[in-house]
């Protein structure tokens, strides 16, 4: 009769300081299919170590161990996990059920790692529990089951993938006599159905129910009667094997790991929430700073554009503050005409200015009077509250008309609904109000000077008596590079004047400087937010490391029922990523709430959540989970199943 399990000269020793302590010494043993064997011995005799080797949880230091003729020493860890999963079923003294799972879910665990479809394994788990008399306890957690019921759940779990070999470690040690008798009756039934049952016990009454008693003392077998060949029922279920394609197995494995991770998180809600808190704050900070920062940036740039972007100012002299008399008359009307003819020019306006007294009735105020063309308001993107700008005829005829700014209108006409057509005195010259322009922000804040605009011909000839221009402002067509336009302007006027007696001021340079400044500030704030995200990630890693320590026995149970190291790694890594993703989702929700509140108190801000910002938050959460979950997951995957099961 060929042995199912065969040990030949097996020894097992463990390091203790500088010495090796031998626990098993030159063990040779054969166990045949369908036997019911009891391994007995006092505490410390080595019987549990022998069971761990038989169950492929441990490897011998020397000698060979064969399972169905296969030398276990030639198998890698994944192959050993497969062997445990497909051929062995473990029954533990303390049941080793996972507290956050129901009875049926505990029974399903071996099939999960075998990659069996959910519906199939749920059906089989219920059938096994029904067979063991637990049909009314299928959805109960272990805490609501008696000791005997928990042990029967443990037996059902051992049978889930077939359980060709049942390894029972003190199966009745934590039970009352009645429950113990029920468990032993079940084991005898399994023996009768063709299962190989190996019981490790120190109770002679339990051992007496086996067909063969192997006694071990001080690591050596002192009693090993020959196997009795008996005819058995061939009722052992075949090992459950997943035959689905590789990609489907991977998808199923990932889905189940995700489900188990969610259940583990739900089992410790408060700790999970506190773990997420750092991620929530970090993601909310990053998203809020990116989104609100972008809104602030757009608002600043919009304000700058409102002052007239794509504009180039031309002034006489070498630079601001140059009052050299030889440059004062550098800019002429002919220069304006030449500039207006350029194909890349949208519009151009001259400017002359002087302080004047403006009077209406008994109201007398000081204003800054600007002589400009009708294109001035287009150049600076200004709109009108009332009336309109002056036309070409008024410009040519040096018409006595004026456009007021909103502040001037308020000072002169505090109670009038419409001021177009009213006559005021500009100096000593009567002028007709033809429009009121909207207030425009200054680059340096709002000035306290009141502004009015007259046709530059009127201003030059009737008021100032000068033929030159104080400045020219050019609006470049959309799509034209302002730097190139500035170079062409410089080249044009230098050729006309024969020298460079002017300088230019490109508003786009202000825009670019503002963009650079806001980007730098936003980057700095984002880095601060990222630091909070890193702190949150470290919190996740810390809690996950604690979780690995707390759940060491759970890891050992999972490995005993067939989980590979990669399965454990995947599960804990997914848990970390899931914590970060849920925290990220809550962080995004928090940032949306912050944005909503900001819009209530800052109505001028347009805060929008772009797909890029949301995708970035998702990637940040995932990356944080992977980065800070890797170390705890790796530590969990590296645990030795025997050590893990022995932890309290």
Curated annotation (Swiss-Prot):
The chain crosses the membrane at residues 273-293, 417-437, 523-543, 577-597, 611-631. Belongs to the ABC transporter superfamily. Macrolide exporter (TC 3.A.1.122) family. Keywords: Antibiotic resistance, ATP-binding, Cell inner membrane, Cell membrane, Membrane, Nucleotide-binding, Translocase, Transmembrane, Transmembrane helix, Transport. Homodimer. Part of the tripartite efflux system MacAB-TolC, which is composed of an inner membrane transporter, MacB, a periplasmic membrane fusion protein, MacA, and an outer membrane component, TolC. The complex forms a large protein conduit and can translocate molecules across both the inner and outer membranes. Interacts with MacA. It comes from Salmonella choleraesuis (strain SC-B67). Gene3D superfamilies: P-loop containing nucleotide triphosphate hydrolases. One of its GO terms (cellular component) is plasma membrane. This is Macrolide export ATP-binding/permease protein MacB. The gene is macB.
């Amino acid at each position: 009769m060929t042995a199912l399990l065969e040990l030949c000269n097996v020894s097992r020793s463990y390091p203790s300081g500088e010495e090796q302590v031998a626990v098993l010494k030159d063990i040779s043993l054969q166990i045949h299919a369908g036997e019911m064997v009891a391994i007995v011995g006092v505490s410390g005799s080595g019987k549990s170590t022998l069971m761990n080797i038989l169950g492929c949880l441990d490897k011998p230091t020397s000698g060979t161990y064969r399972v169905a003729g296969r030398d276990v020493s030639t198998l890698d860890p994944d192959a050993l996990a497969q062997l445990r999963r497909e051929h062995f079923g473990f029954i533990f003294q303390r049941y080793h059920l996972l507290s956050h799972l129901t009875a049926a879910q505990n029974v399903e665990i071996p099939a999960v790692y075998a990659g069996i479809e959910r519906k199939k394994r749920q059906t089989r788990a219920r059938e096994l529990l029904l067979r063991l008399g637990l049909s009314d306890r299928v959805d109960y957690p272990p805490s609501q089951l008696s000791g005997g019921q928990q042990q029967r759940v443990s037996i059902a779990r051992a049978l889930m993938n077939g359980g060709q070999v049942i390894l029972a470690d003190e199966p009745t040690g934590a039970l009352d006599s009645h429950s113990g008798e029920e468990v032993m009756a079940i084991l005898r039934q399994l023996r009768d159905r063709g299962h190989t049952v190996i019981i490790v016990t120190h109770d002679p009454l339990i051992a007496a129910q086996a067909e063969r008693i192997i006694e071990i003392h001080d690591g050596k077998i002192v009693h090993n009667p020959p196997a009795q060949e008996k005819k058995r029922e061939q009722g052992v279920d075949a090992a459950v094997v997943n035959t689905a394609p590789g990609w489907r197995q991977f998808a199923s494995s990932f889905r189940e790991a995700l489900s188990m991770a969610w259940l583990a998180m739900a089992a410790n809600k408060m700790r999970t929430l506190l773990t997420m808190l750092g991620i929530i704050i970090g993601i909310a900070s990053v998203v809020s700073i990116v989104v609100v920062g972008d809104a602030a940036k757009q608002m600043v740039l919009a304000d700058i554009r409102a002052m007239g972007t794509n504009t180039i100012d031309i002034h006489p002299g070498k630079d601001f503050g140059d009052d050299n008399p030889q440059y004062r008359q550098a800019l002429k009307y002919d220069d304006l005409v030449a500039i207006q003819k350029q194909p890349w020019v949208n519009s151009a306006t001259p400017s002359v200015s002087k302080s004047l007294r403006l009077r209406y009735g008994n109201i007398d105020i000081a204003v800054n009077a600007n002589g400009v063309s009708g294109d001035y308001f287009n150049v600076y993107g200004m709109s009108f509250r009332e009336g309109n700008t002056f036309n070409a005829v008024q410009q040519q005829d040096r018409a006595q008309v004026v456009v007021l700014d909103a502040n001037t209108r308020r000072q002169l006409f505090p109670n009038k609904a419409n001021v177009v057509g009213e006559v005021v005195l500009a100096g000593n010259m009567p002028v007709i109000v033809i429009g009121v322009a909207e207030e425009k922000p200054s680059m340096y804040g709002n000035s306290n000077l009141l502004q009015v605009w007259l046709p530059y011909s009127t201003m030059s000839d009737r008021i100032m008596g000068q033929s030159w221009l104080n400045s020219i402002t050019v609006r470049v067509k959309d799509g034209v590079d302002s730097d190139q336009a500035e170079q062409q302007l410089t080249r044009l006027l230098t050729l006309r004047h024969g020298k460079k007696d002017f300088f230019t001021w490109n508003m786009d340079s202000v825009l670019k400087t503002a963009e650079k400044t806001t980007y730098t500030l936003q980057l700095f704030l984002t880095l601060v937010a990222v630091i909070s995200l890193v702190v949150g990630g470290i919190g996740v890693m810390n809690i996950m490391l604690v979780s690995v320590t707390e759940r060491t026995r759970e890891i050992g149970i999972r490995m005993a029922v067939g989980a590979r190291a990669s399965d454990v790694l995947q599960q804990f890594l997914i848990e970390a990523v899931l914590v970060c993703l849920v925290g990220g989702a809550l962080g995004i929700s928090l940032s949306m709430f912050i944005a909503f509140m900001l819009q209530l108190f800052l109505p001028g801000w347009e805060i929008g959540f772009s797909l890029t910002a949301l995708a970035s938050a998702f990637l940040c959460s995932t990356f944080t989970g992977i980065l800070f979950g890797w170390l705890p997951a790796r530590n969990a995957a590296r645990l030795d199943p025997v050590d893990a099961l022995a932890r309290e």
